[in-house]
Amino acid sequence: ALENVMLAKELLAKAQPDYKTRKKEIHNEIETEAKSLLEQMGLADRMNNYPHQLSGGQCQRVAIARALALKPDILCFDEPTSALDPELTGEVLKVIKGLADQETTMIIVTHEMAFARDVSSHVIFMDDGCILEQGTPSEVFEHPKEERTRQFLSRFTNG
């Protein structure tokens, strides 16, 4: 997991003009940051594991740490829990909620409606590739304007 989180950052570091003279120092900085990110993801005990030794939720959290290592302005998630069983889904959603609490800007495509309502500052409801409705979680979830939005949300509120 540690090497996975470090890889992209190390490849980028090799393009720095002073890389050859600061190689060890740069490597140590990247490693320290990667360890910190894995700890933040709850994976301190899995740093030396390979992907085949990790659960789906753990692999997803390694991927989040790898993305964070590059210090992006925006993190994009496309159904981050769709391939996970319910127990592992909670682990990943907890990490994403923590990022939201730190005011990390994220775009999340999800069918986890309760999660979207609780974590989002802005919600967009799309149908057939088109934006049908957007607004605050309260506006979209509690007072939807569009019939299609109401129809979709009724599946989650009426059982």
What residue ranges belong to the model's regions?
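Hydrophobic anchor residue at the start of the ABC signature
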Residues: 64
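Catalytic Walker B motif of ABC-type/P-loop ATPase nucleotide-binding domains
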Residues: 75-78
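A short, surface-exposed alpha-helical micro-motif characterized by mixed small hydrophobic
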Residues: 116-118
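H-loop/switch region of ABC-family ATPase nucleotide-binding domains
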Residues: 110-111
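Conserved ABC ATPase "signature" region
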Residues: 6, 10-14, 18-45
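Conserved signature/switch motifs of ABC ATPase nucleotide-binding domains
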Residues: 49-52, 70, 102
